[in-house]
A protein has these predicted regions:
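Conserved class I S-adenosyl-L-methionine
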Residues: 28-40
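Class I S-adenosyl-L-methionine
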Residues: 188-225
Length: 225
């Protein structure tokens, strides 16, 4: 999706500088990065590997090409980055780990909040420094979002930051409810709106006059204590 260029720009403008700041040897550590509802990792390719829209398209040009990620994973002020990916698709998780996009994977139906995998997801969220969740929160129940955000804000780095997307024109009331949850638990940093993808014929019939689905990109940070 063309929107990953804009996710990359938001990441570079508002998240990367926080973790690129000079730190003493005593505080040097691994940056824990969580891709929530990661699918096959396009946004991680954009944010951590610096790949643009055309490069990501080229990555998926054939079954051989997609097995090599050309650009290396970035570091933050020489701190290593550990990537945890969480998604319902075992195929996506296997791919991401095989090609080196992900270090740890959790296959989880996030709306099943009694599963062991959901507990593992909450543990990952509580240890996260950076979380991205792009064009995916709409699929999660509000109770799931509430629990995951609570796990994030009660653990991990004081500088924890998050990049999320809201789809438009779909499920706008749910998007508003999700925003209220996020703003209760996190501080707002920045936002922008972008194109996401062309709408299908059925979608255009359901939303007359619309040709593109849009994304609203938000960056948030943990509230200062």
């Amino acid at each position: 999706y063309v929107s990953d260029d804009f996710n990359q720009q938001m990441f570079e403008a508002h998240i990367a500088p926080v973790f690129d700041e000079k730190s003493s040897a005593a505080t040097k550590k691994t940056i824990n990065y969580v891709d929530l509802c990661s699918c096959f990792g396009n946004t991680t390719m954009a944010t951590l590997h610096g790949m643009g829209y055309e490069e990501i398209r080229d990555n998926w040009s054939n079954e051989t090409r997609c097995m090599t990620i050309d650009k290396p994973r970035r570091t933050f002020n020489d701190q290593s980055t550990a990537v945890t990916a969480i998604d319902i698709s075992p195929q996506a998780m296997k791919y991401g780990k095989t090609v080196g996009l992900y270090d740890t994977t959790i296959v989880c139906d996030l709306n099943n909040r009694t599963s062991n995998e959901f507990k593992l997801t909450k543990d990952a969220m509580s240890n996260a420094d950076i979380i991205i969740s792009t064009a995916s929160l709409v699929y999660l129940e509000l109770e799931t979002i509430e629990e995951l955000m609570e796990a994030f804000v009660t653990g991990g780095s004081e500088n924890g930051m998050m990049l999320v997307n809201f789809l438009n024109p779909f499920a706008l009331e749910k998007a508003d409810a999700t925003k209220r949850i996020l703003l209760q638990k996190l501080d707002f940093v920045a936002s922008r709106a972008t194109r996401h993808r062309r709408m299908s014929k059925l979608e255009q019939d359901n939303y007359p006059g619309e040709e593109w689905s849009l994304l609203e990109l938000w960056v948030l940070q943990k509230k200062k204590k």
